């Protein structure tokens, strides 16, 4: 089958936002206007097309990124709807990794909210161009210009309106296009009848002022436009649009649009902006990767003529076709039935069928081309972040950063029959979601699951029950602590056993130093003269890695430590890998005596919104929970408090806040960083873990 849409006419976009900003409804409207669905599904009725999991429809939130393809103005738009809840950050991250552009949806009443900051930061990290859609203009308290100001104040974004609303709240009836300088007036509730008129007289001054600001902001990103602007020459609409497109693609400028997806206003104009200002696969730099045979960096430009290269960004279990692997094709062409190489795992995979997804319905296709997003059936070894390439032109593309889980729960099957089913279910769920970890406590045999938050684990336990029919008892949530060293030290690990049978001999000197936060464990071999033979070096590193899985203070994993093996000795006959592994672990234990070991706890960035009169209560809550206030701002009659609070102190806070504010207060929290626990708390944790009361 020949290519239907050229690369220039392809857009791969994500829709991202804070929970409840109206993201899924916006995607629904896009599908409605592009002819994909005939009836609009409302999220609050539990009938949305993109939210296809049972739980999503019940909870009215989006959990998995559904991928769908639509057509607009002779362009193909592949859309990924991402979750806005902080517990599902990995879904946002893996989507951003394979997108070329994104639409950030704001709630016009609240502007930038905590999770907006998180997804914005992630999009900046991946260099994703964005346009902003200020949604819910029909809502009480909607304020477009306030929303724009929050983009400047909270995100330091060079964001400027390319539209202005006509009216707001119940009176929201149209949109001013600042490029054409025309007004779009909506005459019905389906948003299909739109009249283009001159700008109403009472809005003309404001429109001229904001067009001037827009021209100035765009001119600052382009030398030619700047010269014309300074010389007082007129900048044409075409030049202005070209300037906005160039600056947006270079991530120097963010156009802001307005509308109400629920009331069907502004969505078509937003689709026009996706085509006009967001990049095609040809507009962004060619993807880079490493050739596994030569270790040299190579690029893969977006072209059907190049060798095939794709990135798997999501695994999903479909009730009808089994395991689905979603992938983005960066270069080349792939046909169903062909073989590819998974360069991340070094394994050959056969592509059974290729499906193009529309939320949860699917269409089988024979061929995918560069720039496409599709799902494959039949891949056995491929997981999130793996590269799939032509067998003759290997390349490993940059993978996806997976955040560490911060919360854990104990789960146990209710009956013996559930035992095996639970193992299979947890394994499948962990394949789909890299931030979900499953471990078995060797001593107690208990199964511990870890994830990004209470809702995250809730949803997974719920899915285990619904999809895999496993009934399980769930323990109280526990915090995922970490351990580290705060001082440098040198320590010897000496292991010798020479009585009866084969002897054992291992002797190492290791220097331990604290590593930068987030850098993890780093091992350096500084042995000279072969005092520890080369074949035993990996055993020393392995011995340290295994010992660090159970830290020296309370058995939590150790992080951010550098270990330099610089001296030691061996025995010609008795030395073995096992002996050096044990010696390395003894060296770590010895180091703990002088390296100031510390326990680290996850600190959450908590944003609490309460009525003015409850501000004092909230400040008290933060202090009582070992937190520190980072900032406050007034918004209408509410106060917004930002604070850093240990996760351990936040369990059950929803109930406390609800009763203190008579149900009017809300809070959001997102993991921010790890920090040393105070000495008194550390002693309690150690006691508890040693089984003392």
UniProtKB/Swiss-Prot annotation:
Pfam families, per database record: EF-G_D2, EFG_C, EFG_III, EFG_IV, GTP_EFTU
CDD domains: EF-G (cd01886), EFG_III (cd16262), EFG_mtEFG1_IV (cd01434), EFG_mtEFG_C (cd03713), EFG_mtEFG_II (cd04088)
GO cellular component: cytoplasm
Entry annotated with the keyword Membrane: no
Alphabetical GO biological process terms: ribosome disassembly
Binding site residues for GTP: 17-24, 81-85, 135-138
InterPro entries given in the database record: EF-G-like_DII, EFG_II, EFG_III, EFG_III/V, EFG_IV, EFG_V, EFG_V-like, G_TR_CS
Compartment(s): Cytoplasm
An example molecular function term from Gene Ontology annotations: GTP binding
UniProt entry keywords in alphabetical sequence: Cytoplasm, Elongation factor, GTP-binding, Nucleotide-binding, Protein biosynthesis
Annotated family: Belongs to the TRAFAC class translation factor GTPase superfamily. Classic translation factor GTPase family. EF-G/EF-2 subfamily.
Role description: Catalyzes the GTP-dependent ribosomal translocation step during translation elongation. During this step, the ribosome changes from the pre-translocational (PRE) to the post-translocational (POST) state as the newly formed A-site-bound peptidyl-tRNA and P-site-bound deacylated tRNA move to the P and E sites, respectively. Catalyzes the coordinated movement of the two tRNA molecules, the mRNA and conformational changes in the ribosome.
The protein's name: Elongation factor G
């Amino acid at each position: 089958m020949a290519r239907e849409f050229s690369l220039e006419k392809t857009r791969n976009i994500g829709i991202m936002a804070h929970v409840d900003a109206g993201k899924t409804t916006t995607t629904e409207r896009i599908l409605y206007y592009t002819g994909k669905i005939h009836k609009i599904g409302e999220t609050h009725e539990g009938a949305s097309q993109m939210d296809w999991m049972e739980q999503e429809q019940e909870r009215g939130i989006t959990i998995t990124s559904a991928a769908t393809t639509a057509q607009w103005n002779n362009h193909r738009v592949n859309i990924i709807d991402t979750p806005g809840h902080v517990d599902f950050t990995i879904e946002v991250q893996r989507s951003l990794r394979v997108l070329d552009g994104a639409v950030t949806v704001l709630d016009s009443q609240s502007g930038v909210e905590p999770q907006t900051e998180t997804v914005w930061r992630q999009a900046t990290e991946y260099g994703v161009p964005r346009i902003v859609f200020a949604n819910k203009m029909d809502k009480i308290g909607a304020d477009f210009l306030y929303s724009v100001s929050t983009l400047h104040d909270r995100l330091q974004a060079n964001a400027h309106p390319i539209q202005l609303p006509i009216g707001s709240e119940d009176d929201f009836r149209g949109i001013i296009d600042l490029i054409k300088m025309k007004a779009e007036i909506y005459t019905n509730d389906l948003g299909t009848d739109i009249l283009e008129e001159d700008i109403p007289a009472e809005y003309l001054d404001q429109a001229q002022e904001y067009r001037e600001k827009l021209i100035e902001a765009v001119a600052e990103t382009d030398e030619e436009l700047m010269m014309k602007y300074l010389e007082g020459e007129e900048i044409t609409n075409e030049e202005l649009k070209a300037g906005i497109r160039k600056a947006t693609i270079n991530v120097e400028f963010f156009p802001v649009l307005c509308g109400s997806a629920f009331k069907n206003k502004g969505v078509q104009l937003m689709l026009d902006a996706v085509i006009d200002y967001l990049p095609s696969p040809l507009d962004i730099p060619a993807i880079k990767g490493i050739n596994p045979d030569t270790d040299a960096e190579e690029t893969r430009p977006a072209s059907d003529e190049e060798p095939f290269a794709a990135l798997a960004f999501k695994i999903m279990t479909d009730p009808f076709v089994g395991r689905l692997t979603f992938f983005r094709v960066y270069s080349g062409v792939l046909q169903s039935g062909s073989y590819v190489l998974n360069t991340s795992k070094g394994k050959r995979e056969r592509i059974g069928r290729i499906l193009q997804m529309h939320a949860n319905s699917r269409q089988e296709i024979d061929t995918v081309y560069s720039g496409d997003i599709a799902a494959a059936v039949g891949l056995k070894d491929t997981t999130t972040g793996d590269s799939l390439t032509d067998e003759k032109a290997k390349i490993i593309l940059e993978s996806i950063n997976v955040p560490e889980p911060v919360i854990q729960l104990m789960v146990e099957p209710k009956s013996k029959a559930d035992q095996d089913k639970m193992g299979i279910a947890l394994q499948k769920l962990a394949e789909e979601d890299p931030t979900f970890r499953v471990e078995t406590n060797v001593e107690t045999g208990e199964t511990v699951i870890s994830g990004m938050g209470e809702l995250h684990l809730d949803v997974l336990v719920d899915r285990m029950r619904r999809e895999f029919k496993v009934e399980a008892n769930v323990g109280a949530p526990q915090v995922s602590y970490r351990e580290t060293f705060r001082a440098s030290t040198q320590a010897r690990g000496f292991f010798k056993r020479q009585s009866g049978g084969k002897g054992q001999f291992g002797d190492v000197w290791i220097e331990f130093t604290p590593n930068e936060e987030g850098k993890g464990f780093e091992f350096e071999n500084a042995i000279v003269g072969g005092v520890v033979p080369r074949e035993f070096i990996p055993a020393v590193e392995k011995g340290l890695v295994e010992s660090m899985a159970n830290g020296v203070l309370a058995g939590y994993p150790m992080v951010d430590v550098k270990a330099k093996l610089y001296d030691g000795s061996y025995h010609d006959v008795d030395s073995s890998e096992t002996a050096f592994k044990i010696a390395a672990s003894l060296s770590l234990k010895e180091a703990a005596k002088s390296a100031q070991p510390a326990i680290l706890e996850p600190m959450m960035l908590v944003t609490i919104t309460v009525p003015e009169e409850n501000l004092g209560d909230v400040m008290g809550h933060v202090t009582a929970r070992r937190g520190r206030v980072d900032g406050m701002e007034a918004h209408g009659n509410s106060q917004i408090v930002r604070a850093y609070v240990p996760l351990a102190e936040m369990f059950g806070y929803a109930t406390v806040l609800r009763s203190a504010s008579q149900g009017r207060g809300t809070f959001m929290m997102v993991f921010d960083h790890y920090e040393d626990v105070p000495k008194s708390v550390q002693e309690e944790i150690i006691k508890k873990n040693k089984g003392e009361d």
